[in-house]
């Protein structure tokens, strides 16, 4: 089990202890720091919905350091990001790979950032199938459908032609932040908080 830091705040009623993620949530910050699976996705979705209900007009800041993971879980986060009213700022720290890259690109245009030493990876979904031949054929068809859906999402958010995205995701495609900016996955490479503040102003 991973260690979760706690922070203690002094209030008029005494001390109050938060786990670090709850404290960040108070400042409308969501942090994805693991692979994407159903449990993680449900937690992210709950936070997005809570922040919308708290203030539908105020931006949400979504920090991403993820190797990717489940496509269906990632799509659930992606659809929720599109569904809710607040605009979402995405920031890549470390890496945004596979579904992580899709979520990074899904931030509102003009509000997608990366720190300078991060890396971004796009590729096609992976599948390892077992079972009867007919079942494997069905699963393979579903992987192809998901692959096409992901390519269409990336094309939509980057402005790249679908055919180019299809070619680029056929194999692992690693990008530096500057390359990701040129590709259209992000809008800005930032060095520090001052860079972010100056862009937002």
From Swiss-Prot:
User: Which InterPro entries would you find in this protein's record?
Assistant: ClpP, ClpP/crotonase-like_dom_sf, ClpP/TepA, ClpP_His_AS, ClpP_Ser_AS
User: What does UniProt list as catalytic?
Assistant: 98 (nucleophile), 123
Keyword match Flavoprotein: no
Catalysed transformations (reactions): Hydrolysis of proteins to small peptides in the presence of ATP and magnesium. alpha-casein is the usual test substrate. In the absence of ATP, only oligopeptides shorter than five residues are hydrolyzed (such as succinyl-Leu-Tyr-|-NHMec, and Leu-Tyr-Leu-|-Tyr-Trp, in which cleavage of the -Tyr-|-Leu- and -Tyr-|-Trp bonds also occurs)
Q: What Gene Ontology biological process does one annotation of this record name?
A: protein quality control for misfolded or incompletely synthesized proteins
| UniProt main location, coarse | cytoplasm
> What are the UniProt keywords, alphabetically?
Cytoplasm, Hydrolase, Protease, Serine protease
MF term (GO), any:
ATP-dependent peptidase activity
Which GO cellular component terms are attached? cytoplasm; endopeptidase Clp complex
Q: Give start-end ranges for the coiled-coil region(s).
A: none
Say if the entry is tagged with keyword Manganese. Answer: no
Q: What is its EC number?
A: 3.4.21.92
Subcellular location per UniProt equals: Cytoplasm
Give the disulfide map.
none
Q: How does it assemble?
A: Fourteen ClpP subunits assemble into 2 heptameric rings which stack back to back to give a disk-like structure with a central cavity, resembling the structure of eukaryotic proteasomes.
Record function comment: Cleaves peptides in various proteins in a process that requires ATP hydrolysis. Has a chymotrypsin-like activity. Plays a major role in the degradation of misfolded proteins.
Which family is annotated?
Belongs to the peptidase S14 family.
- NCBIfam families from the entry? clpP, PRK00277.1, PRK12553.1
What is the protein's name according to its record? ATP-dependent Clp protease proteolytic subunit
The organism of origin for this protein = Desulfatibacillum aliphaticivorans
Q: Report the gene name.
A: clpP
């Amino acid at each position: 089990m991973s260690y979760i830091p706690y922070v203690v705040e002094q209030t008029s009623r005494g001390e109050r202890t938060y786990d670090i993620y709850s404290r960040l949530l108070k400042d409308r910050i969501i942090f994805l720091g693991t692979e994407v699976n159903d449990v993680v996705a449900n937690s992210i979705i709950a936070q997005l919905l809570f922040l919308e209900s708290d203030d539908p007009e105020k931006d949400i800041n979504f920090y991403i350091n993820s190797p990717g993971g489940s496509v269906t879980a990632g799509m659930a986060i992606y659809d929720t990001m599109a569904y809710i009213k607040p605009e979402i700022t995405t920031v890549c720290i470390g890496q945004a790979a596979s579904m992580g890259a899709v979520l990074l690109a899904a931030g509102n245009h003009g509000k997608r950032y990366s720190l300078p030493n991060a890396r971004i990876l796009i590729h096609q979904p992976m599948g390892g199938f077992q079972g009867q031949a007919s079942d494997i054929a069905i699963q393979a068809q579903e992987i192809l459908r998901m692959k096409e859906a992901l390519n269409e999402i990336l094309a939509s958010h980057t402005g790249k032609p679908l055919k180019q995205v299809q070619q680029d995701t056929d194999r692992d495609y690693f990008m530096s932040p500057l390359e990701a900016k040129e590709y259209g996955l992000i809008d800005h490479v930032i060095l520090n908080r001052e860079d972010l503040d100056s862009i937002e102003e």
